[in-house]
Amino acid sequence: MKITEPIIKEAQEKMTKAEDSLRRELGNIRAGRANASLLNRINVEYYGAPTPLNQMAQISVPEARVLLVTPYDKTSLKNIEHAIMASDLGIAPMNDGTAIRLVIPQLTEERRKELAKQVKAVSETGKVAVRNIRRDMMDALKKAQKNGDLTEDDLRDLENQAQKVTDESIKNIDKITEDKEKEVLEG
């Protein structure tokens, strides 16, 4: 029975990582409110190397729909502005010479529905990842049984345990998705 504990534990850890990945991915979908995580994926050309924006500037939220990007090095202001314009955010940066303001526009009803669909698609990708982890876990358990490390009864018990772990992870993903959809649709 001991040989299978790492299999279940590893699968649980992978499922938790899949949930965390989903949270990060959904965090990039903006819901009409300013959130510093919107800028996490932006890299700025800095002394010839692409550098994450959050490593070269302070990002704050002075108002509900405004992000303020204050670079640590004022000479990088233009590069930051260009990187934001080149991104897929669809937000025009306003450079005041010392910082960049990003005003998040109000979302239209149509755009909210589009974002809700995007949330569902990202969520489904997370569920597929969890199911793939479950499949790999089941394969490993069956292999252990085939090698004589498990009895039929042990295998059945562990398969039930694996299913519970999977169901819990899917339930967490559904909750994360529901919360994000509500955030997007209500704005």
Curated annotation (Swiss-Prot):
GO-annotated biological processes: translational termination
Matching Gene3D superfamilies, A to Z? Answer: 3.30.1360.40, Ribosome-recycling factor (1.10.132.20)
For molecular function, the Gene Ontology terms on record are:
ribosomal large subunit binding
Q: Which InterPro entries match?
A: Ribosome_recyc_fac (IPR002661), Ribosome_recyc_fac_dom (IPR023584), RRF_sf (IPR036191)
Keyword entries, A-Z? Cytoplasm, Protein biosynthesis
What GO cellular component is one of the record's annotations? cytoplasm
Taxonomic superkingdom? Bacteria
Q: Where in the cell is it found?
A: Cytoplasm
Matching entries from NCBIfam families are given as: frr
Give the matching HAMAP family. RRF
What role does it play? Responsible for the release of ribosomes from messenger RNA at the termination of protein biosynthesis. May increase the efficiency of translation by recycling ribosomes from one round of translation to another.
Q: Which PANTHER family match?
A: MITOCHONDRIAL RIBOSOME RECYCLING FACTOR PSEUDO 1, RIBOSOME RECYCLING FACTOR
Q: Which protein family is it in?
A: Belongs to the RRF family.
| The protein's name in its UniProt record | Ribosome-recycling factor
Native organism: Ligilactobacillus salivarius (strain UCC118)
Q: What is the lineage of its organism?
A: Bacteria, Bacillati, Bacillota, Bacilli, Lactobacillales
Q: Which gene encodes it?
A: frr
